[in-house]
Curated annotation (Swiss-Prot):
Cellular component GO terms, alphabetical: cytoplasm
Family: Belongs to the aldolase class II family. MtnB subfamily.
Cofactor info, note text: Binds 1 zinc ion per subunit.
Source species of the chain: Schizosaccharomyces japonicus (strain yFS275 / FY16936)
Example of a GO MF term: methylthioribulose 1-phosphate dehydratase activity
Named cofactor requirement(s): Zn(2+)
Protein name stated in the entry: Methylthioribulose-1-phosphate dehydratase
Pathway info: Amino-acid biosynthesis; L-methionine biosynthesis via salvage pathway; L-methionine from S-methyl-5-thio-alpha-D-ribose 1-phosphate: step 2/6
A GO biological process held by the record: L-methionine salvage from methylthioadenosine
Highest taxon of source: Eukaryota
Length: 232
């Protein structure tokens, strides 16, 4: 990925600027939900051939438009880099895999506790499976083009193993995407999730729906396995 060249600031473009503002807003919401903490997690939104990416090493609840990186999806050149010493997101190679493999228009990477706990609970499983929840009606079969799940369907979200460096996850993520055409999310063990969508709205909703399933499942599991719980 080449460094940004001297050219007019693409952030003045209305669509790109709007994407940058949305990223700041969504990151604050993710922070309040406890799905990103400190500088962890990441998000990107695409408009045409331009992809706007939150930086690495910046607290997500304090992001501003000027902090964003902008890249050309076609050339992989950076069209805008922040003036301060910000680093491109370590998630960028994974975001690019999602964009090119699924023709997505946004991708969110959380560091939620629920995803981490779930990956430990199902340490021997290849997928998290869910069935019978009404929220499943809002989750697409990989893409809205394929329709949506019904509450009686079984949703299967693949697990992939974590790596020492975020960028090294790309091959694991790509394999999971290729082998699971009807998923819109992947769980990274002891790390978090990547969820995407046909628009930023879809990516946000898919993230929220998947995290909801994790939360409900874990609460149900705790109740059923707690020695202090009694049912009458």
């Amino acid at each position: 990925m080449a460094a940004a060249k001297e050219k007019s600031d693409v952030l003045v473009n209305n669509e790109i600027h709007n994407c940058a503002e949305l990223i700041c807003s969504i990151c604050r919401q993710l922070y309040k939900s406890g799905w990103v903490t400190g500088t962890g997690g990441g998000i990107t939104i695409r408009t045409g051939d331009h992809i706007v990416i939150a930086p690495s090493g910046v607290q997500k609840e304090k992001l501003e438009v000027k902090d964003m990186f902008v890249m050309s999806l076609t050339t992989r050149d950076y069209l805008h880099t922040p003036k301060q010493n910000s680093k491109p997101s370590q998630c960028t190679p994974l975001f690019l895999s999602v964009y090119t493999s699924r023709d997505a228009y946004a991708c969110i990477h959380t560091h939620s506790q629920e995803a981490v706990l779930l990956s430990n609970l199902f340490a021997q499983k290849t997928h998290f499976e869910s069935s019978g929840f009404d929220v499943q009606r809002y989750i697409p079969r990989g893409s809205k083009k394929n329709g949506f799940y019904k509450f009686e369907d079984t949703i299967r979200i693949p697990f992939i193993n974590n790596t020492a460096h975020e960028s090294d996850l790309q091959s694991n993520l790509q394999k999971a995407i290729n082998e699971n055409p009807y998923t819109c999310a992947v769980i990274v063990r002891n790390h978090g999730i990547y969820a995407w969508g046909d628009s930023w709205e879809d990516a946000k909703m898919n993230t929220e729906a998947v995290e909801y399933l994790f939360h409900v499942f874990l609460r149900d599991y705790r109740i059923k396995h707690s020695k202090n719980c009694r049912f009458f």
